[in-house]
Amino acid sequence: MRITIAGKIGSGKSTVSQEISKITGYSVYSSGTFFRESAKKMGMSIEDFNRYAETHPEADYATDGMQKDFMETHDNIIVEGRLAGWICKIYSISAFKVFLYATRYTRLVRFSNREGIEIDEAAKLLDEREISEKKRYLDLYGIDIDDLSIYDIVVNTEFMKPEEVAVLVLNRIDEMSRKEVYTPRILKGM
C-alpha cells in the first residue's frame, strides 16, 4: 500500500505522516526533501529555488521524476508532498490519497513556529511559496493544486491532534478496503 499525504504549508503533512508511520511501520518519504536537496546543491534557499524553478522547468521535472520512479518501485510507504497524489493519479500509481487542510492563520502559526520566524515574515514567505507553486504546477502539468477531487479523504487538521488524524485516515483506508471486498457479496444476497 502507498499512502500520499498532501496539503498546503503548515497543514500538518509531515507530522501526520510520522504518526501514520508509527502505527503502520511504513517509511515516510518527503518530496520536499528532494526539492530541498536540489536547492542546497545550487546554493539557494527554498524561496530562491522556487523562483528559479519558475523559469527552469527542468528543476521540477527532475524532482518529480525521481518521486514518480520511487513510488512506482516501492510499496508500504508514505509519501508526503504537494504533488504526491497528483503524480499517482497522472501515472496510474495505486495509492490512497490524503489531503490535509487548516485555516491560513493556523498554518501561519505552525509555519512561523517551525521556522522560528515572526508571523509577518512567515506570511510573506508562505504566500510567496504557495503562489509560486500553484503557478508552476499549472504551467508545467496543467494541475490546479487546489482541485481536491482526486483525493480519497480530505481532513481538516485545525482542531485535531496529529494522532487523531492518523487514526481517521487509517480507519478510512480500512473502511474502503472492506467496502470494495464485501459490498458485492452483500448486494448479491439482496
UniProtKB/Swiss-Prot annotation:
Its main location: cytoplasm. It is found in: Cytoplasm. Gene3D superfamilies: P-loop containing nucleotide triphosphate hydrolases (3.40.50.300). GO terms for cellular component: cytoplasm. One of its GO terms (molecular function) is CMP kinase activity. The keyword Hydrolase does not apply. CDD domains: CMPK. ATP binds at residues 7-15. It catalyses: CMP + ATP = CDP + ADP; dCMP + ATP = dCDP + ADP. Its EC number is 2.7.4.25. GO terms for biological process: pyrimidine nucleotide metabolic process. Keywords: ATP-binding, Cytoplasm, Kinase, Nucleotide-binding, Transferase. Belongs to the cytidylate kinase family. Type 2 subfamily. This is Cytidylate kinase. The gene is cmk.
